[in-house]
Amino acid sequence: HADALAELDWQALSADELALVPPVVVLERSRRIFGGGLGSLSGLLRTGRPIHVIVIDDDTGLGPVESSGARAATHPDLGYLAIAHRDALVLQSSLAEPAHLYAGLGRLTQSLRPSLAVVASPAWHRPVDPWIQLAAAHYGRATPCFLYDPEAGSTWTACFELTPNPQIDEDWPQLTVRAAGEEGEPVEQTEVFTWAHAALVTPEARQGVRVLPPSAWSDEQVPIADYLNMDQEPRSRCIPYVWVVANDGELQRAILTREMA
């Protein structure tokens, strides 16, 4: 049997035989990947070998930046980069969505393809509650959950799953804001929840926000959802704002820098 065993490699095993082999799982942090390991990860995803990489990402990209271009440069989306390899299974999930994460990791470990799981984790050192960080990033589309499985079908829609993201048929999810009116009466208002709303949870990002008294409101100030849907020319004459609830429960208008929007 020596000659036969010498020629045997893992590609000669059947699917049932491969299922008996313990999966190879690599655990890494996003900082190390972006710090010089991106090329190695790309090479691994092209090998065709059933090696599974789990990356813990505690950078939601919601921190302060000087321009939108700087934001993109400091926080590339690892999950989207991995999808470009086409033949790899890619999971992007969050500790805030444990059911999605559990199911996705199960698919990952059973796959005979190279795979990557990007798991959003809170920045534990920040003063904001970790789960508020994660929920805000998820609702603000900063860390959307998805699963790309090339074996799920022959079309993009069959291979790409976007559950359990909130209100996936809308640009932004809508939430009900509860606050106090001018006379202290309870009021409710439906608002979209955008990337900028999520960034407000991060103390470092609040330097791009200013709360205005009603006397400073003007027609040039527009809700951020309307601002984002404007063409470039009219947008340049407007200032985006969001509604925030003050410590006393009062609803206040907060304008944003254009980079923040």
Where are the model-predicted features located?
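Cofactor-binding active-site loop characterized by glycine-rich and histidine/acidic residues
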Residues: 1-52, 61, 72-85
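Core active-site phosphate/anionic-ligand binding loop and the adjoining beta-turn-alpha structural block
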Residues: 51, 55-160
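Flexible, low-complexity linker and terminal segments
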Residues: 123-261
